[in-house]
């Protein structure tokens, strides 16, 4: 991704792409963080061969409580024959499905995807137009830097890579100071957020290179009042982490679901996302 999940845009991206191309490779671009660069920078301008746009966040659509996601994939001309089939084409005055694609990689799961999300995004994009999409990016960056400034006023939030400075549409913070002082982890604090009527945030992708991470992405849609409430929530949670650590350790207090055994959930020997996988791993125990 570029900007990276730290919220920092890497200005050397064209040089990276050039080196890969010189070695005979192809470059793919995960546009998960395009919310802050719509109408400002394009994957094509950096020389990428393939990219995808997540419809959640960037195009103002729900992620569905961490899934299912939905995306639009874009490729350069030389990769077009390999796109999944069927492909929607326009011929003889009407739209049709083209299955005659001998070099295609075949179907990629359900062909239609999340239709309702795609229609919602299409209407949103068409209603905004090119100028409106650029405005979306500008507001997303503005919101994120306002939230960043407010959170850095709290004792407990740290900003690594590098310290200080602005970010684009998201920021990865560290709550390691709170952990060092109280033993309360970033995961403990994430669970406590639920008690304030807010969906818990994304901590970090793996590997975790920032200790006790917090990744916040306010986007363009949140008001100043929303973000101020969010900051006040963190201020109160951090205060409680020092004053009454057990309150945070046992969170969520009001959540419908209590804490789960994350070690069990993350163990490859037991984790099963489907019934078929569960049966395969448990065998005669089922």
What are the language-model segments listed below?
Residues 41, 91-108, 118, 125-286:
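Non-catalytic terminal extensions of PLP-dependent enzymes
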Residues 1-96, 103, 183-184, 211-212:
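Conserved PLP-enzyme active-site core in the AAT-like
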């Amino acid at each position: 991704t570029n900007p990276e999940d730290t919220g920092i845009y890497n200005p050397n991206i064209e040089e990276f792409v050039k080196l890969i191309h010189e070695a005979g490779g192809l470059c793919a671009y995960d546009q998960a963080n395009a919310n802050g660069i719509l109408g400002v920078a394009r994957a094509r301008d950096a020389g990428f061969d393939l990219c995808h746009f997540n419809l959640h966040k960037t195009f103002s659509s729900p992620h569905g409580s961490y899934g299912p996601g939905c995306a639009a994939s874009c490729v350069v001309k030389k990769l077009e024959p390999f796109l999944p089939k069927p492909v929607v084409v326009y011929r003889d005055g009407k739209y049709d499905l083209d299955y005659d694609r001998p070099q295609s990689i075949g179907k990629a799961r359900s062909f239609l995807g999340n239709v309702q999300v795609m229609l919602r995004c299409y209407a949103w994009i068409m209603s905004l137009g090119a100028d409106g999409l650029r405005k979306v990016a500008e507001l997303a960056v503005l919101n994120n830097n306002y939230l960043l400034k407010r959170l850095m006023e709290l004792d407990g939030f740290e900003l690594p890579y590098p310290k200080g400075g602005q970010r684009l549409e998201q920021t990865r913070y560290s709550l390691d100071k709170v952990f060092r002082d109280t033993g309360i982890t970033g995961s403990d604090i994430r669970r406590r957020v639920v008690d304030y009527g807010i969906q818990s945030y994304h901590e970090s992708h793996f590997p975790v290179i920032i200790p006790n991470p917090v990744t916040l992405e306010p986007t363009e849609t949140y008001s100043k009042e929303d973000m101020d409430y969010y900051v006040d929530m963190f201020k109160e949670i951090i205060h409680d982490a020092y004053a009454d650590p057990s309150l945070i350790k046992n969170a969520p207090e009001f959540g419908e679901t209590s804490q789960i055994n994350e070690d069990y959930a993350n163990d490859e020997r037991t984790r099963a996302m489907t019934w078929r996988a569960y049966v395969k791993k448990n065998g005669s125990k089922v």
